[in-house]
Structures are given as C-alpha cells and as structure tokens.
Amino acid sequence: MSICLIAEEGADSGALSSLAERWGLVSDPNAVMALVLTTERLELRKQDEPKLGAIFVDFVAGPMAHRRRFGGGRGEAVAKAVGIKKDYLPDVVDATAGLGRDAFVLAALGCHVRMVERNPVVAALLDDGLKRGYQDAEIGPWLRERLTLLHASSMTALRDITPPPDVVYLDPMFPHKQKSALVKKEMRVFQSLVGADDDADALLEPARALAKKRVVVKRPDYAPPLAGVPAQSMLETKSHRFDFYLPV
C-alpha cells in the first residue's frame, strides 16, 4: 500500500523504515494520506486538509481513558449488545476493529477481545496504540492479557481463527448521509483511507458459523440490515442499532 511516510524531527527514522517493512507500506511523497512518526506516537494525517488534524490510537489518555473512567461501564450499549452480565464476560472477536474503541471498552470491562484489522495503515496505528498501552503502569497489565490484534482480512480470520469466540462483533464502515456535514473530522480522514466496506455483507455468514453465542452487527439507524438479512432481535440507541443474529 502506498502512503506518504514522514518521520518528524526527533523521531526515529529507522523505526519508521522498520514499520513500513513490517506492514508492507511503500512511501509515496505525493500521496494525500501521510503516516507520520512523531516523538510520541504514530499518526495518520490528510495532507490536503490539515485542519482535520491527526488520527492516532491512544488507550492511555484522551477520550478513551475518559470513557473508561467516566463512561457507562456495563451500562454502555456495546456491553449490553455482546451480552455482558454479572458473571458472564464473553470472549469476543471484533472482526472490523477500526480504531479499537469498542474493543477497548469491552476489554476494560473484563472481556478478552481479539481485534481483526485488514488495512495495514489502520493495523499499524492500532499496534502503536497497543504497544504504548501495554507499557502503561495502570492499564498495561490487563490490556496485555485481554486485548490483542490480528492483521488479516476479516474473511480469512473468521474462517481460520481458533478457539472460536462466544461473540463476533461487526461494525462495518457505512457511507454517511450526504447531508451529514457534521461527520466527525476524524471519520472523514478515516474514510478517505479505507472507504466503505463494500464487501461487508459477505462477513455475516462466516461470522454466524464461527460465533458460539451470537453475532452483533452495529449499524447506523438509517442503514439496512447487513446482507439484507433481518436481525432476529436488536438493541436501539439514539443514532445506532445493534442487530443480533444466532449462530448457524
């Protein structure tokens, strides 16, 4: 995959070269999307729209840390969706990990979560965030145990992953409504990189074959069900819904 690779002053340019080799990234100085290694972390930037800011994964500070400390805990919709109960913490495969937010919430609540991400740039961002999280004195010990990353296509992972999880969680990228100029800046950068998950419909069947208890599909409230298959039940929130499917 081609992307502009930049090491900022003071950052380790050798580490950037190693990172490019590991994730199969080819440097293109003219690319709109740039992967930038700073002295602190790895960032994704859209060079023609610098005001959109940088995307990075940070499990230690910022919004994710705030959500862990002050969010709804077990009352969060995603926790209810995967079926967390008093003594039940499901093993989860998040087959469309993205920036790892929902996976992190579930791990913070005690679930073991295997994140699957096929895009090498997004996987590199996740891996960078995990490395820093693993080294943190407060969250590192449980994060290392509960949250892991697999860089692979979801189709491959859903076919080959062992042992099978209790729950497969799918949150495929869905095109935003055209009128939605309020789409988060971050989402605009992210969608410029990965686009819509046009093959997401193909994930439902292997997900149902793999999961032991349920498949959970997160959808915008205006989106049709994945693969056109009506959900067997659902949980609705203000702007999203979680569609539930039984294993087959």
UniProtKB/Swiss-Prot annotation:
Identify the InterPro entries for this entry: 16SrRNA_methylTrfase_J, SAM-dependent_MTases_sf
Entry binding sites for S-adenosyl-L-methionine: R101, D102, E117, R118, S153, S154, D171
Q: Which EC number(s) are documented for this chain?
A: 2.1.1.242
Single GO cellular component term: cytoplasm
The record's top EC class is transferase
User: What reaction gets catalysed by this protein?
Assistant: guanosine(1516) in 16S rRNA + S-adenosyl-L-methionine = N(2)-methylguanosine(1516) in 16S rRNA + S-adenosyl-L-homocysteine + H(+)
Q: What is its main location?
A: cytoplasm
Q: Which UniProt keywords apply?
A: Cytoplasm, Methyltransferase, rRNA processing, S-adenosyl-L-methionine, Transferase
- Among the Pfam families in the record, one is SAM_MT
Q: Name one GO molecular function term.
A: rRNA (guanine-N2-)-methyltransferase activity
Instruction: Give the similarity note.
Output: Belongs to the methyltransferase superfamily. RsmJ family.
Full protein name: Ribosomal RNA small subunit methyltransferase J
In its UniProt entry, the species of origin is given as Pectobacterium atrosepticum (strain SCRI 1043 / ATCC BAA-672) (Erwinia carotovora subsp. atroseptica)
